[in-house]
């Protein structure tokens, strides 16, 4: 493994200890056809991290519907992760709507890696140089890696410790990535599942008509260039 990973790179396989036990192979844990999201947080028992993971618990059923497996990571111990679960679930229950079952029980719907020696976090470029523990050791940033079924990196996001992530946005991005992995379209600004898409600029008009028929809405622009071509969400 090298320090840091770029879009399109093969994501490394690794072994890891988690709050749910030892994972001998990250690839085997993901499986052959699933997507995966590896997300790091700076530290257990901290306010922003607790609210983030509570939201992920709420959204876990939505990720599962999309065949996405979730796994967390920080430099805390597996035992610390296990003790933290009750706090996460308590915050989750505070934010649950009536009838929600995602926050019931006292078990997270995803494991959290205990990267105490900071090996994975360092090699994957997850460290935040501005955040340190009481001993001066660097802590992980709020990183998100989305990994496709072929085990390549599809998206990476790196937030500082002071800024919590919007996991509804991560869910939206998954919808876009999964759609554009199988359809020759791109998703425009603020797109949500079911919204119109745009034809890829690499596809000429003749090929676009073969793919999408006559239902292409070409937007007239001052430049006279016909690159903004809208199509309905592909089935």
From Swiss-Prot:
Free-text function comment from the UniProt entry: Thiol-specific peroxidase that catalyzes the reduction of hydrogen peroxide and organic hydroperoxides to water and alcohols, respectively. Plays a role in cell protection against oxidative stress by detoxifying peroxides.
InterPro entries the UniProt entry points to: AhpC/TSA, Peroxiredoxin_AhpC-typ, Peroxiredoxin_C, PRX_1cys, Thioredoxin-like_sf, Thioredoxin_domain
Compartments where located: Cytoplasm
Broad class of enzyme this protein falls into: oxidoreductase
Lineage, uppermost ranks: Eukaryota, Metazoa, Ecdysozoa, Nematoda, Chromadorea
Major subcellular site: cytoplasm
Record protein name field: 1-Cys peroxiredoxin
Species whose genome carries this gene: Dirofilaria immitis (Canine heartworm)
Note: The active site is a conserved redox-active cysteine residue, the peroxidatic cysteine (C(P)), which makes the nucleophilic attack on the peroxide substrate. The peroxide oxidizes the C(P)-SH to cysteine sulfenic acid (C(P)-SOH), which then reacts with another cysteine residue, the resolving cysteine (C(R)), to form a disulfide bridge. The disulfide is subsequently reduced by an appropriate electron donor to complete the catalytic cycle. In this 1-Cys peroxiredoxin, no C(R) is present and C(P) instead forms a disulfide with a cysteine from another protein or with a small thiol molecule.
SUPFAM superfamilies: Thioredoxin-like
Family membership noted in the UniProt record: Belongs to the peroxiredoxin family. Prx6 subfamily.
